[in-house]
Amino acid sequence: AHHSQNRLVHRQQHKAEMRVAQEQIEFYRDLKSKMSTKMVGETLEEHCSTTFEMQLRPHMPYAKFGKDNKTVDGTKGDFIFSNSDGETEYISIMFEMKNESEETEKKHKNVDFLKKLDEDRKKKECEYAVLVSTLEADSDLYNTGIVDVSHLYEKMYIIRPQFFVPLITL
């Protein structure tokens, strides 16, 4: 009788632990869905911004990398990077950040955003356009490096956040 009572106690403990674990999972799931797509987008922007300041700023004294706040013809990109020799700008890149929110039913593809990015780049007179994206997470094409999509839109690339520095230093 003692043996079966021990098993019963263990089973009840196990059930209680499982309930707590399940509640934690629900809590984090809920938290993650509350972090709206915009917030997730913000964190991608923060990632690139911080990376730029820490890794690239020391080597590029005249470079500018910042949020595009000027609306031109109803257009605003996410970020613009430009660099100069102190007087003459010799490169400018329009960046658009896209992040997959797991709660979004509609799965966007990277190519869905290229037309608008190209329009933004032209209106802002940037030489290059880059989509920094976590969309299509299981795509080998995007996971292996810098993807040149210039055959679709001139001077345009799609990258994962970890290729941000390699792209700018090309």
Which residue stretches match the model-derived regions?
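Amphipathic, heptad-repeat alpha-helical coiled-coil/stalk segments that mediate oligomerization
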Residues: 34-39, 45-170
